[in-house]
């Protein structure tokens, strides 16, 4: 019974999975908007690191939780079929960026290519996949949101220090704190909400 209550609480506290995906999109796009050609190399590198970590976590969450659920209910799988290949191309560009020095003339070009790919991917999801999910999934949206929150905690924890370091060392402004910290804040607040209700793993 306690497990059932905990699951109900989790679903109630968590945003729907579609809203979580939109929040992820907003956070990474905010990071993109901070990138300028005349930024210092250190600032560029930190921005790119922040965006890349957020994208990797986001892509893994979608592939493990959202896409499998959508494959069951979607009537038009064309966007789904290209989503994972688009993620893989994104990962290829991320690997290139990580291997480059920010002074490399190709660094800006590669990040701009990543930005274009992500913007196209976001447009497909927000105009096709997410509205379809909201039409056909009903209460499953909150359940999947709770699943994504739990998995996000697991994926984010090992990289929290790196995200915080990139943010606090280079971007003391509120906009960058929001951009880099959106993933961390969502998972932290969800965890605190569970603790505040007194439901621990030991119960």
What are these regions (language model features)?
Residues 1-203:
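Small-residue-biased structural context
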């Amino acid at each position: 019974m306690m497990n059932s209550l905990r699951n109900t609480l989790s679903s109630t506290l968590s945003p729907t999975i579609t809203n979580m995906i939109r929040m992820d999109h907003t956070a990474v796009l905010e990071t993109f908007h901070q990138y300028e050609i005349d930024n210092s190399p250190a600032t560029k590198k930190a921005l790119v690191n922040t965006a890349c970590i957020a994208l990797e976590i986001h892509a893994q969450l979608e592939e493990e939780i959202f896409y499998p659920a959508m494959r069951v209910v979607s009537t038009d799988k064309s966007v789904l079929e290209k989503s994972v290949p688009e993620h893989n191309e994104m990962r290829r560009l991320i690997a290139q960026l990580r291997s480059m020095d920010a002074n490399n003339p190709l660094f800006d070009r590669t990040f701009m290519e990543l930005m274009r790919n992500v913007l196209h991917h976001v447009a497909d999801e927000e105009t096709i996949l997410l509205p379809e999910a909201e039409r056909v999934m009903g209460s499953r949206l909150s359940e999947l949101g709770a699943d994504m929150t739990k998995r996000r905690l697991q994926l984010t924890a090992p990289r929290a220090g790196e995200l915080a370091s990139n943010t606090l060392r280079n971007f003391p402004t509120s906009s960058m704190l929001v951009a880099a910290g959106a993933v961390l804040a969502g998972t932290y607040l969800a965890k605190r909400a569970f603790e505040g209700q007194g439901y621990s793993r030991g119960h």
